[in-house]
């Protein structure tokens, strides 16, 4: 909870200068402020998920994580739609001002929340508010140095590489190659996020009927096929296919994210569960960073089609480790 509050304040302070700075192009000031903001976004995300890992019992994880991730994805879609409207209707400074207002409202939730002094379901066990370095290392080692945890870390380190590549180049690809406008993309992409949010909210029910393994592998395979399909798109590609791709990539990404996070939470059962889950999430953030940074290199080594093929191939380790993690 402490790190959630600190991160939320830092995120708002990092964006505050952008209300007054005229932004006409990318510059060092903009890069520095957004990098600082995104750093605390990552810390906040890890802290929120770690708090959930501590606050929920194992049999609650799938449904609760579905609600968490589904709500987050719905929020991202709504935010993108609202940002597109404000940006094109009023300007970038007004968009940042509105963002800070919304963040100030959201800040009230962690401010008035409470944190358990124990891992949910393990009230009878002794837990300390602060651990020595030796105790921390012992607790982390107990949970992370086993085959399931190693498979989970492998999954997470590859999980967002493809999405990270896509996120960097899709906008330019849709504008330069497919002939779309930035405004069209901005109004369309939230639909995929909203669909992903609905998938997240219903993940617990879907997993009950279809099985967690089938759904996880199905969503990952769908995302890989979308990347492969986009690699073949040209200026003559029907808008309907381009629309399905840009909507589908966010929808299926949210679907498998909900499932894998519930699996990761179930692996965190020691008194360092929050730290352990934070490590898993850290690997996921590193994966996105890898994808974002190699995207220009991959694009420079070939073309857009080659970059999307690399994005698809990066999901193969996730299929293998996902199969292992969902064994009975």
Regions found by a protein language model. Give the residues of each.
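Intracellular juxtamembrane helix-capping segments at the cytosolic ends
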Residues: 43-56, 254-269
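C-terminal transmembrane helical hairpin of 12-TM major facilitator-type secondary transporters
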Residues: 213-263
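A late C-terminal transmembrane helix in Major Facilitator Superfamily
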Residues: 271-300
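Juxtamembrane intracellular "pre-TM" segments in multi-pass secondary transporters
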Residues: 117-151
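Helix-to-loop junctions at the C-terminal end of transmembrane segments
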Residues: 87, 199-212, 299-300
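Loop-to-transmembrane helix entry/capping segments in MFS-fold secondary transporters
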Residues: 58-67, 182-183, 268-280
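Short amphipathic helix-loop junctions that connect adjacent transmembrane helices
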Residues: 168-185
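C-terminal ends and interior cores of transmembrane alpha-helices
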Residues: 5-24, 221-237
């Amino acid at each position: 909870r402490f790190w959630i509050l600190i991160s939320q304040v830092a995120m708002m302070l990092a964006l505050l200068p952008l209300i007054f700075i005229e932004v006409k192009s990318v510059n060092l000031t903009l890069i520095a402020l957004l990098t600082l903001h995104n750093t605390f976004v990552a810390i906040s995300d890890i802290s929120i998920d770690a708090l959930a890992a501590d606050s929920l019992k194992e049999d609650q994880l799938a449904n609760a994580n579905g609600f968490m991730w589904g709500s987050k994805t719905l929020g991202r879609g709504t935010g993108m739609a609202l940002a597109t409207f404000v940006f094109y209707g009023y300007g970038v400074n007004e968009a940042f001002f509105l963002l800070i207002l919304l963040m100030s409202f959201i800040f009230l939730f962690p401010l008035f929340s409470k944190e358990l002094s124990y891992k949910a379901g393990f009230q009878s066990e002794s837990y300390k508010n602060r651990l020595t370095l030796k105790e921390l290392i012992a607790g982390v080692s107990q949970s992370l140095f086993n085959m399931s945890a190693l498979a989970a870390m492998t999954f997470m380190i590859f999980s967002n590489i493809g999405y990270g590549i896509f996120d960097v180049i899709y906008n330019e690809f849709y504008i330069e190659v497919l002939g779309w406008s930035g405004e069209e993309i901005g109004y369309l992409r939230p639909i995929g996020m909203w669909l992903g949010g609905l998938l997240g909210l219903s993940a617990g029910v879907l997993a009950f009927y279809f099985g967690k393994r089938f759904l996880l592998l199905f969503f990952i395979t769908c995302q890989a096929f979308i990347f492969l399909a986009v690699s073949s798109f040209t200026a003559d590609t029907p808008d309907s296919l381009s629309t399905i791709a840009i909507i589908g990539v966010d929808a299926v990404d949210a679907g498998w994210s909900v499932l894998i996070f519930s699996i990761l939470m179930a692996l965190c059962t020691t008194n360092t569960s929050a730290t352990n889950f934070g490590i898993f999430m850290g690997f996921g953030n590193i994966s996105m960073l890898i994808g974002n940074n190699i995207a220009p290199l991959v694009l420079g080594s070939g073309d857009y089609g080659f970059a999307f093929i690399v994005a698809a191939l990066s999901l193969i380790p996730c299929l293998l480790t996902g199969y292992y993690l969902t064994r009975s």
